[in-house]
Amino acid sequence: MMNKERFARVVEEMKRQGLTQILIADDPAIFWLTGRIVNPMERCGAILLKDDGEVHAFMNNLFCFEPIDGMTMHYYADGENPYKLIADELAPGKVGFDKNWASKHTISVLKERDDIIPVLGSDPIDVCKSHKDEAEKEALRHAANINDMAVEFGIKHIDPSLDELTLSNMIEEFFEEHGAVQDMQLQYVCYGKNAAEPHHGAVAGEMLKEGDAVLFDLWAPINNYWCDMTRTVFYKSCSEEHRKVYEIVKAAQQAAIDFVKPGVKMSDVDAVARKVITDAGYGEYFLTRTGHGVGMTVHEPPEASPSCDLIAEPGMCFSIEPGIYLKDDVGVRIEDLVIVTEDGCENLSGDIPRTIEDIEAVMN
């Protein structure tokens, strides 16, 4: 059914941003608003929302997108022109287009009308989706709990006879057994110097050696909400240099988590973590942003980065994941998801060990 409260929130945000009409085509956004899953692939599928609350849906008649109370449905068949259907309902002037809509769809709508001005229209949805309600928070907690179990599973199954890809596939199967719906997404399992590549994908034939770091960056959708968590462990032994790097990253992450509360800039969350690493002499090896939003997608606003001046507000969920990446040597990243509360934040993976000693206890 149509979530009237969420539509109303988006309309209010549209008005605040000076938008009178937006086209919504992002599958997770449509699901968030309607509870309906749409996967049009190359076909056109979109919702038009106006600032008076009027809602239109434009769907191919093959989509099985049933009529919804309060929404005007416009169906088209293969071979018919859906863009004229959309254009006929647009008022002259600015139209907010979905940032994730393929350009062929945007251009095709623009060809139908010469009196509309395309602008980016995803911000009202992004702002509203970033503020999780209680049901969404509970879904994120549940997903994080499964992720915690997957990380522990991975740590306990570290074995020199398993290459990265084999262990990654084992974790993938664990997720699926616990309700995750994966879409050909390999979990990041990185041995040794491969952990120094922030987005290294697990590969066949990469074997484990004593003293290697093992970086697990695991994520999955559970009941339509994502989890995302990273732990770095060391196999059998840990050099003093690697231990030093690990402790710096752990301190940076904790400093950022302690800093999070309503009213702080997301860029300052990044700055707090970055300062710890920079002051320790490793600033040039912190290659990524500090975090990203998580919800119905694994990467969504807000992000904790130097360029993001969004303000942290209650209900926002994002990762805190500083790292140090020493090329051809080691990479250390520690990641947890937090939800902003009224006076700080809730760490969704707070029970999973972060000290080297506690992680070794899990391994053994």
Please place each PLM-identified region on the residue numbering.
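Active-site neighborhoods and metal-handling regions in enzymes and metal-associated proteins
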Residues: 1-364
